[in-house]
Amino acid sequence: MKDPKLLERMKDYKGRDEVPADFDTFWDQALANLTSLPEYKLEEQDFSIPNVACYELTFKGTRDGSVYARVFFPKTDQKVPVIFHFHGYMGRCWDWADMLAYTVAGYGVVSMDVRGQSGFSTDGDRSPLGNTVKGQIIRGAVEGPDELFYKDIYLDLYQLIEIVASLPQVDDSKLASYGASQGGALALIAAGLNSRIQATVAIYPFLSDFRRVLEIGNTSEAYDELFRYFKFHDPFHETEDRLMQTLAYIDVKNFAHRIKGQVHMISGLDDDVCYPVTQFAIYNRLECPKEHLIMPEYAHEAMNVQVNDRVYNWLCGSKISFQYVEK
């Protein structure tokens, strides 16, 4: 940890800008416009894995997007709880084998490709094929909140949860969301938009406190497009306030008050991609049961020491021990 006083400064920090006055109205109306379940296909796959049913799920998203997800359900006569997993920025859904660990505990797992990134989901009328990840944060920001690219990603999350909750195999009272970086952000958004989500695990969540990102000068690959917008389109920042006001509608910290279920967060204090201060802006706005674990020596990197076991315990109610105790 480079600055021992960092935690003290962040413990009450809630972000640079406030939630737009019409924020909840905006999102409630966007959800209300999704009047019914979208068209979807759930196709079983034969992977010769005993005791697990494997499916590919595709559905029609907003703006004619096509959304792809992988689904595992334990083979049982009982309805199963489900964990929704979301991947990092520019990535894709879990490999099939990565999903198996949770089925051992009796959980279904759903892992979704974010449209326009590296998986099979596509963006319909705006960019029908291929990876369009660069520029997704600011896409639509000049036109206004309704045109934001991430608005459609967030609505994909809501519809995915509704589809899965409607399936006969699923216990829709026991749904959880999980992810890291962009995935952590989407796990929180899923809980903020769909009250079916009762538990969330978010590791170093992305997409928070955009004005602070600008002030810090975070030119990491994840936020590069934000800085390129100003450098090459608005070098005197004449549109900064308007752009920030628009991006506020997809800022994760602004969804925090909508989350009702338990939230567990993990942050690394050396994170120079999703700076800790922007993560605290989310956590300090949460009004639900919550826990925040800090890893002082970690940056925006794989957290493989004890973290996966803790996440498993949080999501599955298991009691995996983290330390060897000699008996």
Predicted regions located by residue number:
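Acidic catalytic loop of the alpha/beta-hydrolase fold
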Residues: 269-274, 301
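N-terminal targeting or regulatory segments adjacent to alpha/beta-hydrolase or S9 domains
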Residues: 1-51, 324-327
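N-terminal cap/lid segment of alpha/beta-hydrolase-fold proteins
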Residues: 33-77
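Cap/lid segment of the alpha/beta-hydrolase catalytic domain
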Residues: 94, 100-103, 107-155
